[in-house]
Amino acid sequence: MWSLLTAAVLFARLSIAVPTTAAPAIEKRAAPTVQLDYATVVGSSALGIDSFKGIPYAQPPVGKLRLKPPQPITGDLGTVQATGLPRACPQMYLKSDDIPDDILGRFINTPVFQKITHAGEDCLTINVQKPSSATPESKLPVLFWIFGGGFEFGSTQLYDGTSLILRSMAQNRDIIFVAVNYRVGGFGFLPGADIKKDGSANLGLLDQRLGLQWVAENIEKFGGDPEKVTIWGESAGAISVFDQMALYDGDNTYKGKPLFRGAIMNSGSVIPADPVDCPKGEVVYEKVVEEAGCSKATDKLDCLRSVDYTTFLNAANSVPGILSYNSVALSYLPRPDGKALTASPDKLGRSGLLAKVPLIIGDQEDEGTLFSLVQNNITTTEHLVDYFSTYFFHGATKEQLRALVDTYPNDPSAGSPFRTGNLNQLYPQYKRLAAMLGDLVFTLSRRVFLDIANSKFPEIPTYSYLGTYGHIIPILGTSHGSDVLTSFGYTPGIPSTSIQNYYLSFVNNLDPNKGTPLGFPKWPRWSEGKMLLNFEAVKNSLLKDDFRGESAKYLEEHTDILHI
């Protein structure tokens, strides 16, 4: 049996954690202060950067506001000390069985795990970090970060924009970094017919949207330009970025102006999903209701709002999570609600109902390895078919799923971690399952989305990449979540330097090439030959985006039956 700590260390690689680093000494000068309409916000300074962490952007979603859309702040909060550790929203703590310790043992003594602390329902806050020299007249571009964590974990506690801001300052193309806290798990993405009827679905997405509206109202006071916002996310955060493009049928405006002008998606894009009141959603809802002791209540949803915090937390966490055998067949995720998310994201994309903004989107080479470690009883092709039929795609027949599985050779040398021959075969179908999960949720879904985007909006620039710099890591390869450490500058090297430079160019100019220092290859638009920028360990190169073409074709032609 795995301990909770071991599971947490694993999920640290899944992108909810960044390394712990020694905090820089606070500069001895007057604390930076920003006057908002509803509060005086006091921050801290270090390394020429002012940080304001834990600024409330919504009323606390507690009591009668639990499981309700976020509400703007209406009163005066007085002085807000935005200098400590922001409270995390309630987390979905998971258990995972049967993963050999030696796979992740090397991570235990490295600084890849930082425990999320101080969690609670009063968690809707936002972080702002800016160059100390920025004034309301600076009009700096803004990078708006949405964390990942499978819609179950994550917090702004774990992400710091210092490395990105320092690089931007050194290159005289300053940016402001913003990170938003949003509700996760059953607090933010509870499905069910009662939830839909109440208008309380996809609360985590609505939290993010209110955070963007807060930026539109307030970021100028910190030196930012509300008309130059790029939204960026990883994993569930990247899926959220896509959903922010798709909310309200692609209307991303607030008071007549766009909330963002560009988008960056690391390891995530479109996730076809059944409605919030689908049978699977009802099963999740009824399980939570039962565990909370609300099954006999006249109004079950009202009962869920009235139980104490610990009771609801335990009930919300009683369903399968991402580290369980179910893997990425998530209990909690954005689902069509007929209101904010009017249809499955894939259908909105095909209908052209998306915010039309330039974007960067990419993946790690081995996205599926971390999600395939526990299914060691899957040893045959039929086992694979049964697994996807039982846990994932209830709208597909076994014959259709067998056809999908057959597009992946029953040959370890063709599986993930890719390009490793017959090595790293943890159990008989491990590399095949890892290849499929990585493609279905991330890599080939990205390609299908890009095909749609470029057919619907050929004038909109799109850029795509593949990270392969962790190729030598046994069992995992360049796994899901490894890009977080690279993007935030915690693993110095050519990949980190490259990604930060290209992203800073995009945030400033909506073009990853404009302003990027000499020596970096030109990143072509994806429409120009369907080429990926390949971030390798010691160099960058271009790679044709045509691998696993038969599988990609099947996915594109059968998206309607491959809903989670």
From Swiss-Prot:
The keyword Signal applies. Induction: Expression is down-regulated in presence of human keratinocytes. InterPro entries: AB_hydrolase_fold, CarbesteraseB, Carboxylesterase_B_AS, Type-B_Carboxylest/Lipase. Disulfide bonds join C89-C123. Pfam families: COesterase (PF00135). This is Probable secreted lipase ARB_02369. PANTHER family: CARBOXYLESTERASE. It catalyses: a triacylglycerol + H2O = a diacylglycerol + a fatty acid + H(+). It comes from the Eukaryota. Its EC number is 3.1.1.3. Belongs to the type-B carboxylesterase/lipase family.
